[in-house]
């Protein structure tokens, strides 16, 4: 904190932060439309199930959570509004995700000898929008993922934004956006699987 102005004996303070980096970040709405406890619970259960499936390395089940046109996007910065023509940590459609799943589960995948272990924690689940006609929802949440491999522990944290389509089989992911706290940081080795 730094003093910005003095008025008599009172001093007003303003946070000293990197205004340029903060100013261009998109800000999600602070409040949401009223949603039923049942809808909130259904969305939370979906996100918790996704985290458990990822931790168990059940790639086929995880891929089945996506629509056929689904995308998984992890931009480098929160200010990115378009995945096309800009660097991304991940920008994959379902076909590319299938290729990655086969690669990391292949018996000769050196990068997975030994395989990594992960633990996902998802919280702060907020339904931002509900389409009254289709039942589709946009949801934001926070996550923390811990990865352990070869005596190295790595932590990834940030925000998820899911665009979920309501189908006869339940919700399916049309878009999952992952904004890492340290998305523009350096990594000592490549992120092998999804966050």
Residue ranges and their predicted role:
Residues 2-8, 13-15, 21, 134-140, ...:
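Short beta-strand edge/turn micro-motifs at domain boundaries
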Residues 147:
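Catalytic core of tubulin tyrosine ligase-like
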Residues 50-52, 108-115, 150-151:
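Short helix-to-loop capping/linker segments positioned immediately adjacent to catalytic or ligand/cofactor-binding
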